[in-house]
Design a protein with these regions (language model features):
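Acidic, histidine-bearing metal-coordination/catalytic regions of metal-dependent phosphoesterases
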Residues: 2-135, 146-155, 271, 361, ...
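Phosphate- and divalent-cation-binding pockets in alpha/beta enzyme and binding domains
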Residues: 63, 206, 325-326
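Extended active-site neighborhood of metal-dependent phosphoesterases/phosphodiesterases
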Residues: 75-76, 98-116, 173-271, 285-299, ...
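Extracytoplasmic/periplasmic, Sec-exported soluble proteins
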Residues: 123, 136, 140, 152-155, ...
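Conserved, compact domain cores that house catalytic/ligand-binding motifs in diverse enzymes
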Residues: 125-196, 201
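Active-site neighborhood of phospho(di)ester-bond hydrolases with catalytic His/Asp-centered motifs
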Residues: 130-132, 159-165, 192-199, 242-243, ...
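Solvent-exposed loop/turn segments at secondary-structure junctions
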Residues: 134-137, 166-170, 199-203, 236-237, ...
Length: 435
């Protein structure tokens, strides 16, 4: 009798588990691909093209009107859609175009819409706005956005990066509307958003549905064949975007092999690499713990940092940990924090100003910057009450980064929600520093 009851109980539990699994899959699918209304936004920007995407409540043929001074050209879809995509190609590099989008079932905000194609001008002044873990639609997020707008003082952003966790808590279509599209409407009119996936984004499948990234090297760099990791160039900066959440993080995995090929071919003066999980942190996550984030921080540190430093990457940006942490110009620290030795791992000990040879030299020093602080609504308290020894600069208040690249100098500013610049550092490159 007891055996029979146990069998029946087990069968019921299996049935309920299967039912839950099916229901859960249904929720994930619904949240990931739910049809929502969405204003036009820019994607997959290159020197010669850009993609425009938007979503309407009814099926219709969308059109984009565009031109350098007037809206003299038109590109339309061939079949009615709800999810719209139009690629504008045959454009001129480093050129600003006006554009507007026509839709019948959705009121489009076409005020002040323009974009600028990517440039290969090594002398251009480039301003890069970096947001990390910005997907909470809250007062902090809005204050961080407003503080950067005031700090820019009317200057335009050339490149826009997000470090993952772009829509809390689960990266659904509706959460992306709230945490991204409703939060940054003006920037979305003018700039393609280059983003990496975070752990919260990966709870649903909307990320790779919303975003479209270059896979064939069309924006610069070596073709990756995958939107999970890719590269693009703007001015004299080579950007590399990696998926530390869902992709194989092994040293012999496809992402690592592609990274080596891409960096070996890179001829740009500056290289910035972006991935979500920081190799060094004592913020809201602990990079010493293999149990934290299922070892992703450890794996990125052990398997990817040797590649980045071998090819003389200048700056590595990460989020995930809700704070601001920064290293000095450093190298070769691939172990846990208790193995840190300043005499071995710090290349230059100045707190703010760094010098590098204009030629790429292996292991000449990299700055690691955690900036997952764009919507966390922090109280200024370090949850671990200790700094990571590799990261002597650390603050636990919300803000975002402005990176300004002018020829052979890169300056990074951490602008917090009240407008104060809490940290500023620079790297200068010259033949005079080649010793």
């Amino acid at each position: 009798m007891i055996k029979k009851i146990l069998k029946i109980t087990l069968a019921v539990l299996v049935f309920l588990g299967a039912l839950y699994g099916i229901g859960r899959l249904g929720v994930v699918l619904y949240d990931s691909y739910k049809q929502v209304e969405r204003q036009p936004y820019l994607q997959k920007q290159t020197q010669e093209s850009v993609v425009l995407k938007w979503q309407t409540p009814e099926k219709e043929k969308g059109c984009v009107r565009y031109g350098k001074e007037t809206l003299s050209q038109t590109r339309c879809e061939e079949t009615p859609q709800k999810n719209h995509r139009i690629e504008l190609d045959g454009l001129q590099k480093a050129t600003t175009y006006l554009y507007s989008v026509d839709a019948k079932s959705l009121k489009i905000d076409n005020d002040d819409r323009y974009f600028t194609t990517l440039s290969d001008d090594a002398n251009m002044t480039q301003r890069i706005w970096v947001l990390g873990d910005s997907g909470n639609y809250n007062e902090s997020q809005q204050e961080v956005r407003t503080a950067m707008k005031k700090h820019l003082g009317g200057k335009k952003i050339d490149t826009w990066l997000m470090l993952g966790d772009n829509a809390y808590r689960s990266g659904t279509q509706e959460q992306y509307n709230k945490g991204l599209f409703n939060a940054y409407p003006d920037t979305l009119k003018h700039n393609a958003l280059w983003a990496v996936i975070g752990n919260h984004d990966a709870r649903r499948w909307a990320f790779y549905d919303i975003f479209e990234f270059p896979v064939n090297g069309e924006a610069g760099g070596v073709a990756s064949g995958s939107e999970k990791y890719y590269a693009f160039d703007n001015g004299n900066v080579h950007f590399v975007m990696l998926d530390s959440q869902t992709e194989n993080r092994g040293a012999e995995g496809d992402m690592a092999k592609w990274l080596q090929r891409d960096l070996a071919a890179n001829k740009k003066l500056w290289t910035i690499v972006v991935f979500h999980h920081p190799p060094y942190s004592k913020g809201s996550h602990d990079s010493d713990s293999y149990y934290d984030s299922r070892g992703r921080m450890v794996q990125m540190r052990e398997n990817f940092l040797p590649i980045l430093e071998k090819y003389d990457v200048d700056l590595v940006l990460s989020g995930h940990s809700h704070g601001y942490e920064r290293s000095l110009l450093s190298h070769r620290q691939y172990g846990y924090s208790d193995t840190f030795d300043a005499t071995k791992h710090v290349v230059q000990s100045d707190l703010h100003d760094y010098k590098k040879c204009e030629e790429k030299r292996p292991y000449s020093g990299t700055i690691y910057n955690v900036a997952g602080a764009s919507s966390a609504d922090q109280n200024g308290i370090n949850p671990f009450n200790v700094k990571h020894p590799m990261m002597p600069v650390s603050y636990f208040t919300d803000g975002s980064l402005l990176i300004t690249v002018v020829k052979n100098k890169m300056e990074v500013e951490f602008v917090i929600r009240d407008g104060e610049v809490l940290d500023r550092y620079s790297i200068e490159k010259s033949a005079a520093f080649c010793r």
